Each structure stands twice: as C-alpha cells, then as structure tokens.
C-alpha cells in the first residue's frame, strides 16, 4: 500500500473521530511523507499545526495507523521546511510503506515515559470547579498506586482533560519509581492487540504484557462494548491486576452504567473503586488555560483577544487550545498583529459552525430517557413493554435524523439490534408524526433540546 493510500484511509477515519473544525484546521491538508523504522513522518505546511498535532493528536493518529497498516507506527508531524533536515539523502517520494522487521516489532511495546506526552503533567493541568475532584483523585492514585482508589474511573466529554490526567499519573508514578512498569493504552489498541495475539498464536505473550505490570491506564473503555471476547480477556486481566494490588485507571465518555452491551461483571468491577466525572470548564478556568498556554509558549497576545476566545469557545479544552493555535497561525500567515477583530475573523468558522459539537446517540438516549422516564440502560435491554419500546423507537428515529451514524452503528448502541429494527423504528415514528400533530410537537421539542445539549 502506498503512502498516499495509507494516508487517505487515515484521514477518512480521522474525519469521523474528530470535530469538523479540528479536522479541517489541522489535519485536512497534511501529507504522509514516509514510514520507516516504526515512525510515520507527516508533512504540515504550518509550523503551529505541526506542533499542535504532535501535542494533541499523535495518540489518536497512532491508533488509526495501527488499524490501517496492522502494526505499531508512531506519527511525527514536521513542516515542509524541516523535511530537508529529515530526508538525509532519502528518495523524495517513497512508493511503498515498509513494515518493520520482526526484530523491531516483536518488543516495540513501551513501558516507560516515552508513551506519555511530555506536556501532560500535573504541573501543567489547570484546575477549576469542573475538574478539581478528578485531579485530586488522580494525584492520590499517582502518589500511592493501588492504595487509594482502585480502579479509578474517570469519565467526561471529549477534550476535557481525561487523557491529560492519565498521562500525568504515568509521569508521577515514574517520577517516584523509575522502575515501575506502566502501560498506557486505549481500548481500541487493546482490542487490536488481542485480535493479533489470537491470529498469531501469541496469547501467552499478550497476557504476560498486560498482567505483569504495576499500573494499567486504559483510555476510552466504552469502545469494548459489544466485543464479547475482548471483554472476557479484559475481565481476567482486570482480576489479575486487582488481586495483585496493581493500579488500574480507566477513562470513558460516560459512566459504567451507561455503557451499553457491557457485561455486568465488568460493570460491577468498574464501580468497585472511585468514579469521577470531568465537566466543561467555566469562564475563569478557560481564561486560566489560555493564559498558561501563552506563558508556556512565550506568546504576546492581548487580554481582550483571550477574553474573546474564552467567551466564544466553551465546549472543551482541546477546542479552546485549538482556537488559540488557529489564531496564531492566521496572524502569522497574514502578517497581521493579533487584535479582537483579527481573532473574530480567524475563528468565524468555528464560532458560526452549527455542528461544532457533534450530537451523540448517548445525548439522544439521555434526553429521550429523561422525558419518558426510561433509564438509559433500558434502551439496550431486551424489554418490549410499550413504556420502553416506544421511547426506544423515538430515540432510534432521532439518532438517524440527527447523527451521521450508520444503521448498524445505531443498532449497536441500542443493545446490538439489527439495522432492520432501526429502519422499522424510523418508518413507524415517521408515520406517527404525520398522523398526530401533538406527538409531532413533542418530538420537535425533544429535537430542540438535543440540539442545545
């Protein structure tokens, strides 16, 4: 597979995972130069974008690359100006990405500090009302692994600092004990490695890797829902670590009780320790984050420009810092000083984009569930009583109307139901909307509430 083909697939997947603003601002115009010795060199024409991608999106792209090429590749974003320093007499346009030899991939799993973003420490984490408790719990776990809260389960929306806290835990543990064996991974990567171990008959090595450690940090655990074999493997891994007093830290975009198609025995174990949630930052925290960022980068940005960003970008920290990066790039490319007017001009696409925050099926289930007094877990259950079945059909209808998810994906979020069930629900609700004006108003009100989440 050529570099161009690989990167086209990576961008296609990334577009689904990232917000439209993040994708179009930072990733859209990048190009894969080469893959060599387990490293993917990716070109970006804007220096700010290259730095930002390395800091904030390297892990996401690494996971996507694993899915596309089938082996571990670390992305490294550089500018076209930096390419001359890197090329070192290489051919200008390599045709095929080469898979590293068995010797280099057999033991390419990192247990040390290299797996963590150097910036993501407790010192750089800005504390506010929405994250004070998760920060305190994470610090307690890092100070005394398996002594305070085990497992520690951190949940919250995208870009609120869950991964930052997990990296900070890893750094702190290694600061206190450089010999500690720490693994940071995502549930997707865990699943892919598990599948590979089955395919290559390396189950024992896989289990040894994940069970002979001191701390396991696993991100986005919600993605193991509906993966029966992966859940079973993780259940035994969890038990082994917990019984041996090893620390487990888990992150998710939702609490355990709201993860559909999760085995009850796993759900109960996730609830053994402490569950903490991170909420979006308030104005003061957003300003503090921006001020800390410009201090770290030694940037000169007027307070009124920061105030504009903090007032306009309220959803999450990643979008907040991304807006700052976009402003800096815009100012540099146009050769204009940063003012409030330039800030508004640079961020107009972000601020005016009506879908900058993607509606999720969980958003829909939550709103519909609250309205009809249905628990979120009942949307995935096999119950067929009208008091549950009809709200479930409404939620399926709204999921098809308000999201870009495929029919099978929607069915999966409703207890692994077949796509034909989703089609039937959509047809049924569409018919009822035409025949019942009161019901139509009801659904329209639900839709407005969901769009305002």
UniProtKB/Swiss-Prot annotation:
Gene symbol of the encoding locus: dnaA
GO MF terms, alphabetically ordered: ATP binding; ATP hydrolysis activity; DNA replication origin binding; lipid binding
UniProt similarity note: Belongs to the DnaA family.
Alphabetic keyword roster: ATP-binding, Cytoplasm, DNA replication, DNA-binding, Lipid-binding, Nucleotide-binding
Region (Domain IV, binds dsDNA): 332-453
Protein name: Chromosomal replication initiator protein DnaA
Primary localization: cytoplasm
Gene Ontology, cellular component aspect: cytoplasm; plasma membrane
């Amino acid at each position: 597979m050529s570099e161009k083909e690989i990167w086209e697939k990576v961008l296609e997947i990334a577009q689904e995972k990232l917000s439209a603003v993040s994708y179009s601002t930072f990733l859209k115009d990048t190009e894969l130069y080469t893959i060599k010795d387990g490293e993917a060199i990716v070109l970006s024409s804007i220096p700010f974008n290259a730095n930002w991608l390395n800091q904030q999106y390297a892990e996401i792209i690494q996971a996507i690359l694993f899915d596309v090429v089938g082996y571990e590749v670390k992305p490294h974003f550089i500018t076209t100006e930096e390419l001359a320093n890197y090329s070192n007499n290489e051919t200008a346009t390599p045709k095929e990405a080469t898979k590293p030899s068995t010797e280099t991939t057999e033991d390419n799993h990192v247990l040390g500090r290299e797996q963590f973003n150097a910036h993501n420490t407790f010192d750089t984490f800005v504390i506010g009302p929405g994250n004070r408790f998760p920060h305190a719990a994470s610090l307690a776990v890092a100070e005394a692994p398996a002594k305070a809260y085990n497992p520690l389960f951190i949940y919250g929306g995208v870009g609120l600092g869950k991964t930052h806290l997990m990296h900070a835990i890893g750094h702190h543990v290694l600061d206190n004990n450089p010999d500690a064996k720490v693994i940071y991974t995502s549930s997707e990567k865990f699943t892919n490695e598990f599948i590979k171990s089955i395919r290559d008959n390396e189950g024992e090595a896989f289990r040894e890797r994940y069970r002979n450690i001191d701390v396991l940090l696993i991100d986005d655990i919600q993605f193991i829902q509906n993966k029966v074999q992966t859940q079973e493997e993780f259940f035994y891994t969890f038990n082994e670590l917990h019984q041996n007093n090893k620390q487990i830290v888990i992150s998710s975009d939702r609490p355990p009780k709201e993860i559909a198609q999760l085995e009850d025995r796993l759900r109960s174990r996730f609830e053994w320790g402490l569950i903490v949630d991170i909420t979006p930052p308030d104005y003061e925290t957003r300003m503090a984050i921006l001020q800390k960022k410009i201090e770290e980068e030694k940037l000169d940005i007027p307070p009124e420009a920061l105030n504009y960003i903090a007032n306009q970008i309220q959803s999450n920290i990643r979008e907040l810092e991304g807006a700052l990066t976009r402003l800096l790039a815009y100012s540099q490319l146009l050769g204009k000083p940063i003012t409030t007017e330039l800030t508004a001009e640079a961020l107009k696409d972000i601020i005016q984009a009506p879908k900058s925050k993607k509606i999720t099926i969980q958003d829909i289930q939550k709103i519909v569930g609250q309205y009809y007094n249905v628990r979120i877990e009942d949307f995935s259950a096999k119950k067929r009583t009208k008091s549950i079945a009809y709200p479930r059909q409404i939620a399926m209808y709204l999921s098809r109307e308000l999201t870009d998810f495929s029919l099978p994906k929607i069915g999966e979020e409703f207890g692994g139901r077949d796509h034909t069930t989703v089609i039937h629900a959509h047809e049924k609700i569409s018919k009822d909307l035409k025949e019942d004006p009161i019901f139509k108003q009801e659904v329209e009100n639900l839709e407005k509430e969901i769009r305002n989440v």
